[in-house]
Structures are given as structure tokens and as C-alpha cells.
Amino acid sequence: MDKYVARELLPFAFDDGLYELRLLTVTKAARNTEVATLLMHAALRWVESHGGTRIMAIGRQEILDMYLRAGLESVGIEIRSGAVTYQALHASMDLMRARSVHFAKMIAGLEAKVSWKLSFPFQRPAGCFHGGAFFDAIGTKFDTLERREEIVNADVLDAWFPPSPRVIAKLQAHLPWLLQTSPPTSCDGLIEAIATARGVLPCNILPGAGSSDLIFRAFRHWLTRESRALILDPTYGEYAHVLEQVIGCTVDRFSLHPVDGFAVDLEKLSCALERGYDLVVLVNPNSPTGCFIQREHLQALLSNVPERTRVWVDETYVEYAGAAQSIEKFAARSENVIVCKSMSKVYALSGVRVGYLCAGAHQLEALRALTPPWVVSLPAQVAAVEALADPEYYAARYVETHQLRAELEAGLRGVGLKTFPGVGNFVLCELPAGGLECADAATLVARCRKRGVFIRDASGMGRGLGGGAGAGYVRIAVRDARGNARVVEGVRASRGSPR
């Protein structure tokens, strides 16, 4: 570009984010084929993977339409080189990404046809969406945390109650030291506290910085692209993301249906478990549905699963169903069952990130070798130990949670939403089709957000939530009485429904 055009004539900055595309050449016959598309895609992925924010190029005049369709814009400067006429072109990478949606199907098809030898992935890695839009209102630089009082964060499933007073007192008493001191390398005290509370041996416990840490660590060790996995649908989105996008293995879905209240048909599931999967994932209670399989039924089901099939049971919300409903003791004696427990949602510790696996020691041995030192921070270890030492406090909060959920369900039904029964700290709702101004879940979520009420569009949390007779689904976390009232009023006002 510098050879033909002075930089001051170009309407963009020459900085470290600017890249020039040059010499992307294919034969004339291939210019409107997949070859040209693949070459452009590879160039854009190179720029994107290296942190580029804008591209510029000189494009031949006779194929200008092809560049424009791809998302490039003409600067309005014509360049001649010999007998060939060119146009100066540019585009932001954000615009190119937005335009690439129109070619997504074609590009996905190309991935299976090419031998990709470049040092970055064929597709831009995408994370799993988990909600948390309320931080857009609070601010992610944490300089306006007082704004949290102005909003209701019901789009993620954090506890509505604070941690045990024991947790707060211990952290406050020792906070400077806790922040400046390295934690025990292997979390020995935390492991012992968990094992004692759950009635298992320390060798049955593997700690982690929340359940996501454990999912990524375990699944990438156990599975390959040739593996086969089974998940519920709908269920917690991280599982499909890790299995399909990170590992790339085959994933089958056990569909749950609204006509059944999204309950799991154990007889059908038992048949599915005989198909020789490498991994089966069961979230119990399930999210976003809230449905729950009783302990005795689940243990009977899992007792007949072939030993070559690992079964991962996510019990993040099981305390809301009753502490006696956990299958941790069963998993500790099992050859192939692993329980994953987050301490975020039921102990009000989402901010410090602590969780663990409970399983037979032989299943955790290899994962223990892959666990980095200091995997759980010192404040998190101390908070978790103190929380486990105060079961009475949390048991009382779980009782209150059921009461608050019942009140929230009644309020949501009163403004026209259909609610599904569940045992967790959240409510899954279906919007009825037609009849009111706000017709779909995405619109409802956006309008509630403008009122400082953040709820989750659940329509993308499973294939079973993307259709049906209604206008979509939302998942709403249980808040305290005041927060629940704001949620109900926000939904009512956003839908235009009568008081």
C-alpha cells in the first residue's frame, strides 16, 4: 500500500493492529470457488490469531464485487500498476467477523476437506456463554461496585444469601495475610475437611478452582476426538462446549421434553447407557430444568452401567434437594462413577472458585498428577473449610430458598409465564406464544435488562428449548424477597401484561 498511497490519505490508523493482505492469488477459474474462500479465510484467521484489528489490501478492479461481498470496503482511491487497475480496500476485523456469519456453513464444510497445517485453529475458538450480563451494568473494572445495589442479577445462579458468618469472620480477621500468603500446595486441609463432611476418605477427593477447572482437566485427559459421549438435552452448556468444541468428540443427546416437565425417563436412559459410551454426563439436579433424580433411583441406574463407561454426575445443586441425596459415598466405592461438586451455588462462594471431584481413588490418581500446585487460592480454601463447618446455617438457607422459589414461581405465573417444577435455586419458564407485546425470550431479556433486571434467555441452552409451542424459555435465579419482586415487576412491565 505504501508504494502507491500516502498514509495520510487513508482513513485508518497505522498501528500494531493493522495488517496488509498481499498476494492472495488463485487462478482465474478458481476465483469464485471454495479455493478462493479458503485462502481468504486462512489469511483472516492468521491476522485474527495474531491480534490484528484491521486489514488493508489492494484488490483488482475486475473482482471488486468479490471483495465487497467478503466485507471489505473501498477507500475510494484507484491505483494503476501497468495495465491493471486496483482499489484500496480496508475493513475492521469486527466487521469481517460479522460478515463471515453469512459464509459460516460453507467454511464449516471446508474444515472437513482440508489438511490444516497452520499453527492456529481453523475456526476462532469460542467460549461457552454463561450469562453474567449484569457485570455490564456494574462495570468490569470494579470501580463502580456500588452499582450492584441498583440491579438484580438473576441471570446466573449465584446464591441469594451471603456465606456463613463463620466464613466472613475468618476472612475479615486474616484478610491481609490470606492475600499475601501462598496456600497449602496440595490443599490437604481442604481435602480433609471435604472428606470428613462427606463421609469418604481423603483419597476420594480431588480439589479444583471450581467445576469448570475440573471439567477441562478431566475431560481432556480422558477423551479424544474418537471418543463418544452422552449428555442430557437441555443441560449445563459447558459440557457440550468442552466435548464438541474443545475435544471434538462425538456427542449424543438424551432429549428431555417440556410435555414431561423435562423429567428424565430412567427406563429409556438405562437403555441408552448400554450403547458403550466412553463418558456419560448427568447433571442432577439438572440445569436449566431443575429436575432431579432421587438418590436411590440414580444409584440403581448407575449400578448397571458397563464399567468401561465413565459416568460423571454433576451435583452442583444437590444440597437444595437435600444433603442425603448426594451419591458421593456411592461414587467413592464405584469403579466408574465420578461426582463433580461446585461449592459456589450452595455455599455462596462463587467469587472464590472452589470445587472438587469425589470418586474411587483409582479414577483420581492420574488427574491428581495433572493438578497444578496451589490450584485453589488461600482465601478460597479457608472459606470452603469454614463453610463446611457450618451445615446448620446453610440448611436454614436451603429451606428459605424453597419458600422464595415458590413465591417467585407464583409471581411469574401471575404475569403470564409457564413455570416448570424444580428443586434448584432457579425457575425455568416458558413464554406463551402470541397475545402480548413482547413475543420472544430474547426481547424479554433485553427489555428487562433496561430495567436493571437481568435474566437468562434459555432458548440456546439445549436443542429442546429452541422450539415448541411457546415463544422461548427464560431461566431466572431465585433472589431474596425484594429481588424476586423486582424480577416479577420487570417481567410484567417488559411483556406489557396487566397487573
Walk through the language-model features, giving the residues of each:
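PLP-dependent aminotransferase class I/II
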Residues: 164, 186, 336-420
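Phosphate-binding glycine-rich loop
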Residues: 189-228, 246
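PLP-dependent aminotransferase-like
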Residues: 221-282
